[in-house]
């Protein structure tokens, strides 16, 4: 398996990436393809792809919260007929190494298993991240805005900390969430979801296993 960084001018490869992307995520969690292309052009987003025998089998998007200590794992997906082959683990390991070289925490927005009608899938995804070195930012009730104008998604925040950091100040996490909402979702100022998230952030936020 080969994992490489994909550039905006690789049109045929991008078409393959976007096909996996659209088949892997629900509409309320997907940015438009045009938005992703703009982010790649402006170097706010970094894209990696995994190939086996020249076939695209997995993708990983990282969003750089410039000027902060965080990289967001925006999207990670494996082509449906190639799941269960350790491709996700290999991609995630590659992304962790990239974050380490950038000297940044690798952050994830992960669906909360206490909500939704697909709990087994949510638990499986959360367990995947935990098994591969990610920890939970304790008790934060994160909400992903609906990207298609329908319903928001209840989530938790996880991360692979740099330098084994085990605690953050509440103000640092509030600033992080504010930046996520502004830079990824175009939401700033007063917002009900943002206010609800902030109300769940304590003075000190510890990093723990979730399961």
Could you say what each language-model-derived stretch is?
Residues 113-138:
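Conserved active-site alpha-helix within GNAT-family acetyltransferase domains
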Residues 78, 84-99:
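Conserved acetyl-CoA-binding loop-helix of GNAT-fold acetyltransferases
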Residues 1-35, 177-187:
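Short amphipathic alpha-helix that is part of the acyltransferase structural core
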Residues 183-211:
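Long hydrophobic alpha-helical segments typical of transmembrane helices together
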Residues 49, 72, 106-109, 136-139:
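A structural signal for short, well-ordered beta-strand segments and their strand-loop junctions
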Residues 18, 22-77:
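A conserved beta-strand-loop-helix scaffold within acyl/acetyltransferase catalytic domains
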Residues 121, 142-193:
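C-terminal "cap" of GNAT-fold acetyltransferases
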Residues 97-120:
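Conserved GNAT acetyl-CoA-binding A-motif
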